[in-house]
Amino acid sequence: MQQQRHIKWLLIFSTISMLFLNAQTANAHCQVPCGIFDDYARIKIMLEHAVTVDKATDLINELADKTDAQSQNQLVRWVINKEEHAEDIISIISSYFLAQRVKTTQKDYEKRLLEHHAVMVSAMKVKQNVDTKLVDKLIQDINALIKYYPEHEHKEGENKKK
């Protein structure tokens, strides 16, 4: 029993250490500005990250009670994976949308700001928890942004200066 507790603390410490050592920010496009935007693509990318967080959350919950080394190894890997994907969502919202696409001159600026902030808060909460309801809320919050960034076709040369 004491050995299991020691292993569990070692895994927790290892997980936390890996998260800090591997901390990176996701690049959500440039801030040159280049004038090339594909907002809908970034929404889809965030949804893909959220689905990955959902899968990671399910697997973390499945592996939580297992004590064999392989299961504990997989548990740590899924925790790290969940953290990285949630952090990527936060980075896309802050570095791309809030820095470049949400403008103070927009008539609905406050509403947009609140809805984008809600995505960041939801992503933070899924990092802190393994509750699938929080993942559902994250997906719902991301989907709430689609109305601002509908899918459209890019024409060849659309962003080139003449």
Predicted regions and their residues:
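Bacterial N-terminal signal peptides that target proteins for export
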Residues: 2-12
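C-terminal segment of classical bacterial N-terminal signal peptides
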Residues: 17-25
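Immediate post-signal-peptide N-terminus of mature secreted/exported proteins
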Residues: 26-70
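Metal- and O2-centered redox machinery and metal/ROS homeostasis
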Residues: 31-48, 92-94, 113, 117-124, ...
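C-terminal amphipathic alpha-helix
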Residues: 43, 117-162
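Alpha-helical segments in soluble extracytoplasmic regions
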Residues: 56-96
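Short, charged, amphipathic alpha-helical segments
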Residues: 73-81, 109-113, 135-141
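Long, amphipathic, charge-rich alpha-helical segments that form helical bundles/coiled-coils
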Residues: 85-127
